Amino acid sequence: MKNILFVLYEDFHSNSALHVHHFANNLVELGLDCAVAVPRNKHTVSLVGENLTNLYQVTEYGEFYRLNECFKNQKGPDVVHVWTPREVTRNYCRKLRKAYDFQLVIHLEDNEEYVLEKYLNKPFSEIANANGSLNIPENVSHPQRYKEFLATANGVTVIIEKLKEFVPNNVPTLTLWPGVDTEHFSQRKPNPERAKQLGVPDDNIVFSYTGNVHAANTEEVKSLYLAVALLNREGQRTTLIRTGRDFENFLGDDDSWARQYAIELGYVDRSLMPEILALANVLVQPGKPDKFNDYRFPCKLPEFLAMGKPVVLPATNIGLEMENEKDALVLPAVDATHIVDSVTKLLQDKSLYKKLSDGSINFAKTHLSWQKNTKLLLSFYKEI
């Protein structure tokens, strides 16, 4: 085994691309040859950040007949690792099968059935029983074909243990956590020049949230804006610094109640993320246990934890692996009211604030190493 091809469902704008980037780079450093295939726009590899050089080759789906040129030995892939079982990646793999012989590994990072429900705004049972009468877009998983695709895999990696519920019993499975780039995401003092540049008022409580708004998380992100508005109404001047794009009108038509307290930066280069997170007093992952959150690993959480700030998160996904008031503040649900109460508590209790700051760093160092987790992945490749 020498050549590894990662297959992404989207170009490098996606959060998944960052995970693939680090796994591919670390596999190259372990002596393997890696390439990453995207549907189009391979030049977007530059979006992983100006500090992150890719050690792998990048190709587009349409170039699959000369895929061997991506590898030093001029041969095809030995392992194809698909991120994730959406129609666009499944169709690409069907074409690959006609030209190359390889071991297939599929990565799961979401409850694909719930994502499909939200995308089509219909219950999954209705979608699954539609007998082909519904048009399933390429950017989501097909209700039947994704299961058939998983059944053909030599192995499946899951980002969180609960996703194993969707994996056929006879398919080898690895729980594969992401890591965090501690060279760039690490504890530091807020940069006053950056705060001034962004227009952060002096002496305000600051939240930083780095993430897009899509159909599955509208209520969660709205709760963060609501918490900031409530804190301001109570006389605690608070600002939300937000990066990411809005794919939903989640605040309503009259959104001035929320946006007046927010500094919304849209898409920013990843090299700026550490300084943006460092401006925060507390880092909050809103949400609650449900069909969406139980099956995912929020991509921003490793970076939150590595920054050495107290982290507030719900008792689901990674929160179930953390000790409350040691690694983080783990709550049954993180909605607007709980956010207000938690932030007030942390800013008043300096001992707990310090304990959770240290705990977040320790958790990241222990569990969220790209190098360690890549070695687990390599061992899995060898076993299948």
Residue ranges with predicted function:
Residues F12-L18, A216-K222, D269-I276, N281-P302, ...:
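Nucleotide-sugar-dependent
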Residues H338, K345, L352-H367, L376-S379:
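A short, well-ordered alpha-helix in the C-terminal region of glycosyltransferases
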Residues T59-L67, R245-N249, A262-A278, V334:
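Conserved active-site histidine-acidic residue motif and adjacent donor-binding/catalytic loop
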Residues D181-D253, E264-S271:
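Conserved catalytic-core segment of nucleotide-activated headgroup transferases in glycan assembly
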Residues N135-K189:
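Donor nucleotide-sugar binding/catalytic pocket of nucleotide-sugar-dependent glycosyltransferases
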Residues E325-A336, K345-S351:
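Conserved acidic donor-binding segment of nucleotide-sugar-dependent glycosyltransferases
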Residues M1-E50, K75, G155, V228-A229:
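N-terminal subdomain of nucleotide-sugar transferases
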Residues K95-A99, L108-L116, K122-V156:
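Membrane-proximal helix-turn-helix segments that form the acceptor-binding/catalytic region
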